[in-house]
Amino acid sequence: MRKASPTVITHNKIPHPFIVKISVLDSLIILLYFIGIIGLGLWISRRQAKGGREFFLAGGTMKWPFIGASLFATNISSQQFVGQAGLAFAVGIIAGGFQLVGAFCFILLSAFFIRTYMGLRLATSPEFFEKRYSGRCRVVVSFINLMMIILGNIAAALYAGALVLTHLLGWDQLPNAEFLYWIAIFLIGIAAGTYTLMGGLKAVIYCDFVQMVVLVLGGALLLYFGIMELGGIESVFVGNVDDAGRSMWSLLRPWEHAFGWLPMLTGGLILGVHGHCTDQDYIQRALSAGSLYHA
């Protein structure tokens, strides 16, 4: 059997157009996945006690495997599969440097920050500012965090998810593609919002566990088929350079580079501490633990 020759990849040059076509069965699987996730969330909502602590912190009953899986699924989502993958194609493997910094910041969260949060019996990160400073400070921090979540995290996740969904379903090739794109955003928002509002944090964490498995297995398959599409593992390493002739696999970039070692150690660490140690998405999951051990 003749072995395919490696494909030389250069910065911002795609080897060939890649068009995905899915069958009716594929579409049915996607639909069943949405229904299954919503159904799981609704089933959990019927089994848990009602109350503020149960809704926001899952009653403080979650165990570390589910918390860890939920944190992983929160950190690795459509934003990374679409956005960060595209960034890595443009600048190289160094785009994953933020995830390395994030892993270190998760250690900081579990070793230092979460002890303080649990000791003060907090439910949200802005509560810390009220206890430390004033209620006015809490309102300001809450407003800033809310705007960042709406305009940053949620907007990016919905955009990336809808981008993939419309492409998979072939909606982006239809005359009314723009309208169908908004439909995709609406469907994703409804699916996530339904089990979140009905089941609270416990439903979110259990659904995150399922989605973590899907993300890991799907990502592994995507990696395999992507490598095969390029002509084999050699194509990933041989001739994979940017416009300046630097290897796209290099983790060491000049300090003046946008992803150089200095920006990663300074700006990356600051962003990582904010995003992983004070962001409500992450600390709320950690605070759902039944004890400091599970947190």
Regions from the language model: what does each represent?
Residues 72-73, 94-197, 267-275:
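Helix-loop-helix module between adjacent transmembrane segments
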Residues 21-45, 58, 86-122, 126-127, ...:
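Extracellular loop-to-transmembrane helix junctions
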Residues 19-23, 57-66, 83-97, 130, ...:
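Loop-to-helix junctions at membrane interfaces in multi-pass transport proteins
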Residues 1-19:
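N-terminal amphipathic/basic-hydrophobic helices that include classical n-h-c signal peptides
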Residues 28, 35-46, 107-115, 154-158, ...:
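Structural signature of transmembrane alpha-helix termini at the membrane-water interface
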Residues 18-81, 196-199, 215-218:
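Membrane-interface "cap" regions at the ends of multi-pass membrane proteins
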Residues 48-52, 121-125, 276-280:
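Transmembrane helix boundary and interhelical loop/hinge segments in multi-pass membrane proteins
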